[in-house]
Amino acid sequence: MPVTMSRAFLDNFLGNSPKWFKIAIISFLVINPIVFYFNPFVAGWLLVVEFIFTLAMALKCYPLQPGGLLAIEAVAIGMTSPSQVLHEIEANLEVVLLLVFMVAGIYFMKQLLLFVFTKMITKVRSKIYVSLLFCISSAFLSAFLDALTVIAVIITVAVGFYSIYHKVASGKTFGESHDHTSDGYPQLCEEELESFRGFLRNLLMHAGVGTALGGVCTMVGEPQNLIIAAQANWQFAEFAIRMSPVTVPVFFAGITTCFLVEKFKVFGYGQQLPDAVHKILSDYDAHEDANRTKHDKVKLLIQAVIGVWLIAGLALHLASVGLIGLSVIILATAFNGITNEHALGKAFEEALPFTALLAVFFAIVAVIIDQQLFAPVIQWALSYEGNTQLVIFYIANGLLSMVSDNVFVGTVYINEVKSALLNGQITRDQFDLLAVAINTGTNLPSVATPNGQAAFLFLLTSAIAPLIRLSYGRMVWMALPYTIVLSIVGVLAIQLGALEQMTQYFYDSQMLIHHSAQAAADGVVSSH
């Protein structure tokens, strides 16, 4: 039967995506202008829900195409303007540079990372200890690096482990070329492969949550932390001290949760590393040690020195994250002899599709701003006072961060609270407490879904996700125990008065000083 033009069009539209998904996207594109004509506010929330749907279906179709079509239509029908979209991208330029340069920079440090984490996996046989190591090390790194950078590190390590095992299990030697994305090798043991996938899923989720545990603690841990610190005129040490009444108990609760889910093997955790896989990784480690030349050792040393620069540069905020990432690329390639353009290009393959997706997301953010979708929630939260207001802001931030980008949510709320301060609705001390509630509210409950945490979304849409069968639903399920524990411990630290009491203690012991409203007015308004 000959293929008609209409059939060919439908076949080409969104490629190999399921037919029902194609029909759903077309339906959205037809419905949205009609709803917008009658009620722009409802149409705005409908668009947000539809975009979240495209993210949820990331393994059926990469969200850039369906989400991008929705965003283009939103601009075309007047839900927002091209200038507003450009403004959002400009305001978040540091995040864009982070994705373009920092993630690529980590690519050139993967030899060192694979060396360190391979030792960790091969030398520590207890799954519980390995899980705790991954969670704690991710938290530590995230206190100095952006969570996206840390998750890029862990993804690099996981892909390295997976490709090594897949190559050897397929009957090849370490040095041979191999396509680890194909399972069409008869030598592969399906049960063994599934167990290894489960093991890697566990480690990636523990590491992902670790980035949230560490990222909330310091002003460089997450992009929105920088925004909040700038608005409040806080420096690195003051930010960490002010957050500590909430972040310290939450950190220990998170580590305890990591131990418990592994111990009792619930929520998809407790997957063991098969002995055969451990032997392959151990053999690879021994093979690498035996064949490591002086040139290789110098490369590892150079990468270690660059790693020190990376942490120091970010901790001291010597330059923007993206520019430090660019310096990592230049230093790592120059001193390790990588001068071929094709070799350089490979480093950017992982991050650029996600960077384009993030730009589409900023278009959705522009709609949220222009249609004032969060305005009712903000006014409701400001109607409360005192400690109750802190709890309400924490919960309101948490709920919105579960479905929307936490950088955007944090930016919107801190700007609204700052306006309330400058208008005399709240005191400066209350503003400082609210800033803590906003920061912890955007960072902690947002681990619930990949929509809130950019690092989680990056993981979901990365090359490793389909290899280890990490879907949106599975991610939400595995994050659930962490979501419950972190959210509850965080809200209790505020509700029971620990935040107010400890902050007062810090004032009394002169670890903190009282700021004036004018100091906040002098803060730099930013949204990156």
Swiss-Prot record:
Top-rank lineage group of the source organism: Bacteria
Similarity-based family: Belongs to the NhaB Na(+)/H(+) (TC 2.A.34) antiporter family.
Pfam families found in the cross-reference section: NhaB
Molecular function GO labels: sodium:proton antiporter activity
Protein name (Swiss-Prot/TrEMBL): Na(+)/H(+) antiporter NhaB
Transmembrane region(s): 20-39, 66-86, 97-117, 139-159, 241-261, 304-324, 349-369, 390-410, 448-468, 476-496
InterPro entries: Na+/H+_antiporter_NhaB
Topological relation to the membrane, as annotated: Multi-pass membrane protein
Record keywords, A-Z: Antiport, Cell inner membrane, Cell membrane, Ion transport, Membrane, Sodium, Sodium transport, Transmembrane, Transmembrane helix, Transport
Localization, UniProt: Cell inner membrane
Function statement: Na(+)/H(+) antiporter that extrudes sodium in exchange for external protons.
Organism annotation: Shewanella pealeana (strain ATCC 700345 / ANG-SQ1)
HAMAP family per the UniProt record, alphabetical: NhaB (MF_01599)
One cellular component term from this protein's GO annotations in UniProt: plasma membrane
Catalytic activity: 2 Na(+)(in) + 3 H(+)(out) = 2 Na(+)(out) + 3 H(+)(in)
Primary location: membrane
